[in-house]
């Protein structure tokens, strides 16, 4: 049986060990009214006097159904009872796609944090969310970066605002057991039960099957795998950056890559260097097919060749260099 106090102590230790938060910070908590975010709110309230935080709550109502409005009302009442600053966001349009709704939420989180001087935005993503995201991105064909996209802490606005997820080592099952003990009211958004939504299908159909027939501790195992991927990917990104800085040359105000060096390094680093080189000069992202085509041509090129990429980008490859010509000004 999981204990609320023990879990608070564990997460308090994680905050210190991973340097997620500092004392006397102004933090904005995203609260939906569901299990995970209500637990997060209560957790941070238990710790706030020790850490001397100033806490605010933000809630987003997507206007999907009456339950979202009821949940928003409940969260606003909690904020009032706890004497916390409260920010209500109401969707101006109906977002049918999850990605667009998420993008809208995070833009508002960032805007509110910026306008009201919050340095930290905290969301209630758990180890179970990390598992769902890994499968979701895996089925979309993501690389290593996509498989560990839910990270503990990341910068979202220059060096001023960071997004923090302190529950990434805690599963949804652990939280369910705790809520049976403390009996705090929750509001379940019926939209989360709609299996027509891709992520819900993973949560309610795929993962229960895998837990039943393959590993009942699947959430913990996959979350640990995502954590390993994150650490190793950070190492590879740092290594790639160091190598790219050595082989990237500025010629007539244009950045070029030394193709002779690229040919002698492992394929995995070739792909990463090419991807970094392109995405540091363009607002577009490039998928595996684009990167692999460039990598293959770079290794066999005899004559000068042009490759046309999304957004009006043209890449020139010769026997000596790779050059990106872009129509987009920054």
UniProtKB/Swiss-Prot annotation:
Ordered alphabetically, the record's keywords are: ATP-binding, Chloroplast, Ligase, Nucleotide-binding, Plastid, tRNA processing
Family matches, as Gene3D superfamilies:
1.20.59.20, HUPs (3.40.50.620)
The protein's predominant localisation is plastid
- Kindly report, in one word, the top-level EC class recorded for this enzyme: ligase
Function, in words: Ligates lysine onto the cytidine present at position 34 of the AUA codon-specific tRNA(Ile) that contains the anticodon CAU, in an ATP-dependent manner. Cytidine is converted to lysidine, thus changing the amino acid specificity of the tRNA from methionine to isoleucine.
Official protein name in the record: tRNA(Ile)-lysidine synthase, chloroplastic
Q: What is known of its domains?
A: The N-terminal region contains the highly conserved SGGXDS motif, predicted to be a P-loop motif involved in ATP binding.
A GO cellular component annotation here is:
chloroplast
Keyword Transmembrane in the entry? The reply is no
Binding positions (ATP)? 32-37
UniProt lists the family membership as follows:
Belongs to the tRNA(Ile)-lysidine synthase family.
Looking at the Swiss-Prot or TrEMBL record, what is one Pfam family this protein matches? Answer: ATP_bind_3
Which cell locations does it reside in? Answer: Plastid, Chloroplast
